[in-house]
Each structure stands twice: as C-alpha cells, then as structure tokens.
Amino acid sequence: MSTPSIPQFTSPFSPFSSGSHSTGMAPSQTVGLDTLAEGSQYVLEQLQLSRDAAGSGAGDGAPSTSLRNSMSHTKDQPPFDNEKNQSTGSGFRDALQRDPLVEARSAIRKTSSSAPVRRRISRACDQCNQLRTKCDGQHPCAHCIEFGLTCEYARERKKRGKASKKDLAAAAAAATQGSNGHSGQANASLMGERTSEDSRPGQDVNGTYDSAFESHHLSSQPSHMQHASTAGISGLHESQTAPSHSQPSLGTTIDAMHLNHFNTMNDSGRPAMSISDLRSLPPSVLPPQGLSSGYNASAFALVNPQEPGSPANQFRLGSSAENPTAPFLGLSPPGQSPGWLPLPSPSPANFPSFSLHPFSSTLRYPVLQPVLPHIASIIPQSLACDLLDVYFTSSSSSHLSPLSPYVVGYIFRKQSFLHPTKPRICSPGLLASMLWVAAQTSEAAFLTSPPSARGRVCQKLLELTIGLLRPLVHGPATGEASPNYAANMVINGVALGGFGVSMDQLGAQSSATGAVDDVATYVHLATVVSASEYKAASMRWWTAAWSLARELKLGRELPPNVSHARQDGERDGDGEADKRHPPTLITSLGHGSGSSGINVTEEEREERRRLWWLLYATDRHLALCYNRPLTLLDKECGGLLQPMNDDLWQVGDFAAAAYRQVGPPVECTGHSMYGYFLPLMTILGGIVDLHHAENHPRFGLAFRNSPEWERQVLDVTRQLDTYGRSLKEFEARYTSNLTLGATDNEPVVEGAHLDHTSPSGRSSSTVGSRVSESIVHTRMVVAYGTHIMHVLHILLAGKWDPVNLLEDHDLWISSESFVSAMSHAVGAAEAAAEILEYDPDLSFMPFFFGIYLLQGSFLLLLAADKLQGDASPSVVRACETIVRAHEACVVTLNTEYQRTFRKVMRSALAQVRGRIPEDFGEQQQRRREVLALYRWSGDGSGLAL
C-alpha cells in the first residue's frame, strides 16, 4: 500500500490546514485580521469574548455552556482518528460536526455592531517595505508616485518563524528515495502543499506559528509518520559521515527543487525556512553552485573548506566567522574592529539573516553581484547601480575630472566596472567602499527624502565596508593555506604581530584578500575621513594603505609575461578581452621564483601604477597638512613607469602610452591629478625633507649653515622652474593650437573616446562647445598649477608656522627671502582670482586645495597685521581674494580650519581698510590664540587637531 500523502493527516482543527478538506467543513468567509483567529493561541481569547457576548446578549449563558461542552467533547476526542482514516481514507471528521471556534466567532458576530471591519492590504510594494512606509497596495502606489520611485512587487512572499521539522524531514526523505524514482513525487507533494497554501488570502502577511500546537500536532501523528520523520532526520545526520561519492545526491536533489523556492517552502502555513537554517546542514547537502540560480557567477561559488574538491582563489561563503561574506548565510560578522580603530565595528544587527531571492536578471551592472547580498537591507539594487554611475561621473565632457570631491583620481577603468557581460572581478569590500563614497554626495531621492536618510545609509555602508575589509588581516583565506602553513603560523605570530600575513603573500603571490582591491578600499576610507573633522584618525587608514602597498611592492614594475611575449615585445591574445575581464583577482608581486609564470594583463599593471602614484602624492600632501615626515620614498619607485594619460586609460588605448618615463615626474603632462598635481607633489617631497632636516634637534643648525643646504634649495628651485615651463607649454598645446580637430602633436582624446566615459548631460554637445570647454578646462588646470607652484616657492623660502611668522623673533621679515616669498604670495593670490573665475565654487580639487590656499595666505595675514593701513593696494586685493576663496571652500568642502582662518582674515582685512576696533590688542591676541591651534613647528601636528 502506498504511503499516504502529508495533507491526508491535516486536522480541520489545525490553523495550517491546506484547504483541501472543503468537503468536510464549510470554508471560512473571513479575510484579513480574522484569519489570525484560526490560530490555536487565540482559543482562550475568543472563548472569553464569546462568553461576554453571550452574557450581554441572551443573559442565560446558553451559548457559553454549549461552547464549553463542545470544547470538552473535542478535548476528549483525539484530533486524528486512525480508525476513521483507515475506513474512509479521508482523514477528516464528520462534515456535520461544527468547529467550536466557528461557533465562538459566530456568537461574536451576532452580538457585535455592524461597523465595517478594517481591512489590511495583503502586501506592500518593495520600496515601501524597504523604507518601512505605509503603502496603499496599488501599482504604482501613492508613495512611489510622490517621490518618483520605481514601484515593484517583485520580492518573494515569506513566512515568519522557525523552519518546521517536517520540511527538513521531507527533503531528506526525497533525497534518499531519489534513486528509486520517488524523489519527483515527494517534491511534487511538497510544492503542491505550498501552492494550496499560497492560494489562501492573507496568510502570507498574517500567518502565525504556534510551537505548542506544533508539538501537539507531531505527537498526535500516526506511528508510521513518526517513523518516517525520524528516519528522515537521521538521514541528514548520517549524510555527514557518508562516503564522498554519495554526497552529491542530496545536493543535486535540492538543486532540482530550486532553492529559491526551497528557501521559502512551507507546509500548510508553517513559517518559511530562512537561509540561516541551512547552517545546520552538512557540507554535502548544499549544492555546489550556491543558494540561488540567479546568482550564477562561478567565481562566487559556495565553498566549504572541509570539502576536498573545493575550488581555490575564489570568494568564499564558508562557515568561518572571519569570512567577509558570512552575512550572506546569516552568519555573524567579526565581533569587533581592531583596538587601534576608533570607528564602530560592524554590529550583527546590521547584517540580518537574509532569505535569499534570485537577483534580477536585468541587473544593470553585474559587477555588483558580490556585494548585493550584503546591501540588500541597506539600499535598493537600482540605487546601487546609480551610485556606481556617480562614482565614475566626470564633471567635464572634454577631459576626465571626477565629480565627487572624494574621488581624487581614477584608479580603475569605468568600462571594466560597468561592462554588461564581462565586468572586472572585484572584492565586495571595494564595491561597498565605492558605494559609500558615492553616497556622500548623491542626490538620489532615497538618500534625501528624509533628511536623516543619507547619514543612516552612509553609516551602514561604512560598517559594511569595514566588516568586509577586516583591517590589518590579509592572510590566505580559509582552505588556501600553503603546505608549510604550520611553520608560517609561528613566524607570523612572532615577526608580523599576529596580523595573519602569510609568508607566501610576501613572496610571489598575494591572496585575494590582500590584493590591490584592499589598498583601494583603504584609500576610499582614508579620503573621506581626511575631508571630515577627524583628520587625525584618517592617518590610521592612510598608514594601513601605505603599508599594504609596500608589502605588495606596488612601486616596482612586474616582469613581462614571458609566455605571452613575442620578439617585438607585443602581447598575444585578445587585448580587449584582457582589458575587460582580467583572469584573476590576485596580482603578482613580481619577486620570487614563481613569478615568471604568472600572467598579468596590462590593465592590472596600470592599476598597480596608478594606485602607487596616488598614494605617493597623498603621502607628500599629508606630510604638509600634518607636519610629518615622508613615508614612501623616491627610491622605492625609481623604476616605476609614470601613469598614462587619463583619457587614454579610460578607453584602454595602452599602445598609445607605450613610451613613458620612469620615476617621479616633475613636469605637467595632463589634465588629471596624475598629470598636473603629481609633479608638484614630487617637488613638495624635497621641500618636506629640507624642512625636517632644518628643524632637526641635533643636526638642524649645522645643516642650515652649510653649503649643502644652499645646493639643495637651488635643486628644488630648478625643479619648480622646470614645472613652470612645462605648464606654459601645456597651456599653449591645449589652447593656442587647439582647433576643431585634434592636432598632430596632440593625443587623440576627443570625440568618441569620451562619449562613454562622461555620463554628463553635455556629452551630446557640439564639437565647437566641447573645444571651448576644453580650453576653459585647460586654463583652470594651469591656474591651479600656478597657485600651488607659488605656494611651494613660499614653503621653500619662508616659515610654515603662522605663530612664529607673526612673532618674527629672528627678524626674517627684513630679510631678502621674505621679499621673494611675498612676491610669490601676491602671485598665488592672483592665481586664486583666476581660479575663482573658471571654478567659482572651487570644486575641481577641493580635497587637495585647502592647505595650499591656507599656507599661501599666512604672509598676507602677516602683512595686514604689521602694516595695517599702510599696506599696498596689491596686498589689499590679495587679502580680499583669499577671503572669497575661503568662503567658497567652506561651501564646497566644509572644514573647521577654513572657517577659522576666514574669520581671522576678515578681521585683519577690516584693520587694513582702517576699521580699527577699540579692543585692538585683544583682537590681535585672539587671532594668535586661534592660529596656535595649527602649528608647524616642534611637535605641532598641522591641521590634525
């Protein structure tokens, strides 16, 4: 005799009945909140209500007595009558026998008022559900229409509560019967129950789960059903010790059932089983391709380190609590961030246990797939794509210039990230940091509709980024340990401070968790923190980025790919495919016996160069900002190729950039940060070294009076003169000789090359307007370069500390170097006026420009403080320009030191114009106290308060 199906034993008393027993009991006509009354936890409440209603209506208590008798009769009679099941095969009680709950509710309805019952909508749209906003259930709903959001009902219906044992037992039984041909019947039975359950209105929203009834329901099952459940559960445990050849059976069966449905599969109203409940399953139960058919990238397969055939060098969804993708399975992230990190560590509450749904097949940018499981509860998928667009948006259609003030330079190619079919393989931490950077300034409605939305989303993205990055832990991932890992663990614990850096990472290869992506993630974190009021805390992120870049030897060129090189030095293979889709995420360090056989694409090589030069420039910039010595030295990158032109880089024209110089540059070569700002930072590095040598406690005085000092100053001056000449040549090449078409001596960077790299609205402008915009962009670059060049002359000849400058104990104000520095201060102010003409809001390079505007203003403050009404008109105009520039800076990238110096400069300018207050001495003393917060002498930390 065949085994009866599971719905055959469902009691009409059960709140989870599938609805197949309609012949035995009249179907309930209630919907909405009334459906909750069918749960067993409402029996006593409804009984009490029926008593009250009967007492007030009839007064004789007859209904209550009838109901009590009916309940006692039901209590004495078992809910499952095996004899009746065997005789009739229906599994239900007599159709004429009424449910006591129905009688109770009928009594209530007879005595209740005729007021309309408030109905709830069956489900809210995806946007309202994400925002926890009231929804009217329409398509589109009123909320989405008001805020211009995309109204969808695409999310999967879910049930609350713990997964039932029957689901697990049925899955195990289906797997064990697969070889006998019964697995299809079991799956059909389970899926049929889900279909009948979902057909009932209101259960997906209002369904409840009663553990007491569950235990009673299981205990009252027939004996042969209990044996089947026990066998099914034991089968799950036995599969852990089964031979490896038998393991794929259950995984294949679960995959055949489509885990997207198995994830929410229930039995007659039981709550859905979330993905976190699969943690108890053995490794062999889970399918090899992951938990969602929509998430089909093989590089992100579900890997368990205990499996002997697990693929290597891929992102892991294993059982390690240290795993950055652990929230994908509902696991808790690392408990806390390192002790040196003051930022809050990720809380497990921010990483909920997801019930996965298949990702949309129309994902605009597939590169986001690794991070989608982590951001599902933070931002919508469409907003993530929009934020990626914001990250790569250029403010100019003629030349690339990042629109976001927190993107100081492009490290990656836009086309590699946004390619629709073959995107660059990225770590989830890098993607999360890019979304976090873009969310700082995005004007999306999701981030602006409540005023607090941006702060909440940015905080969650920050915690997610830190949780995925795992600061200072860049060892091999679980299951990737080298053969001599046991010995390496001892060495790591002693020599490397227990940070988990493996010795093979310092050799020929680096693991995926310690690659270029992690360095770029540190850069994103450090940049945003540096632009905030927590500048001192940003040095921890910058130091981590510099240290990891040094470990990866990003300052050295990788050896050529011998296996793919021809005699003429060109590479074989499909260059476009290599550019868009690098073969692996890991990058070779190029030093070791095994490095010659590793192939690195030209795009990966250029990413390494650009990342190093960006860190090189910020090291020198922050050395001036925070009065600290250099970290990255010139000798570490003496053989590294200079970065290629940004426009050529974005279109992937590597052949046009084949001939480049090596080592730190000192000439202006392009419109990007790498073209005009990097050479200035090379020169600034020499000035910083001279400044710290001059102020050395033991050797400073002797070095200051030696001929070597004069020789070093002349050398830096020659570099500044070289940069000034290259700046004039650059301006002539891109303004005087610029015609409607590209000239012979100009790189082809116009037209189609920028159509796909500049998503601004001006990309469809005419050729003439683009040429004029290119001229304006060039003159703006020249103005910024000229201003910073004048400031470097001031730093080389003058004093950095404003208090020492105002006190003037050594009478430097009467020296010849002061006159030279003062002329450069006026020249810097004139360049600032030109900058305000082309860039009124100073949005071209707000992250870098503030400190040079400040240092170029100290001499003007000195002149206004000392000369007062006797100051020359040029000095007065220069002071007015500096005040305007600081006001623009405060609007664009608001920082405390700019607000403070604007007030100081305004009071000094008022004195120059003859408005001397009564408390003149007190105001001068107050100015010195304010400036004393920012010191560049002794142990002063500059802008880092």
Swiss-Prot record:
Mark out the compositionally biased spans (Low complexity).
Answer: 1-23
The superkingdom of the source organism is: Eukaryota
- Subcellular location as annotated: Nucleus
Which GO molecular-function terms appear in the entry?
Answer: DNA binding; DNA-binding transcription factor activity, RNA polymerase II-specific; zinc ion binding
Under the heading InterPro entries, the entry gives: Transcription_factor_dom_fun, XlnR/Xlr1, Zn2-C6_fun-type_DNA-bd_sf, Zn2Cys6_DnaBD
DNA-binding region(s) in UniProt: 125-151
Protein family membership: Belongs to the xlnR/xlr1 family.
What is the name listed in the Swiss-Prot or TrEMBL entry for this protein? Xylanolytic transcriptional activator xlnR
Source organism of this protein record:
Aspergillus niger (strain ATCC MYA-4892 / CBS 513.88 / FGSC A1513)
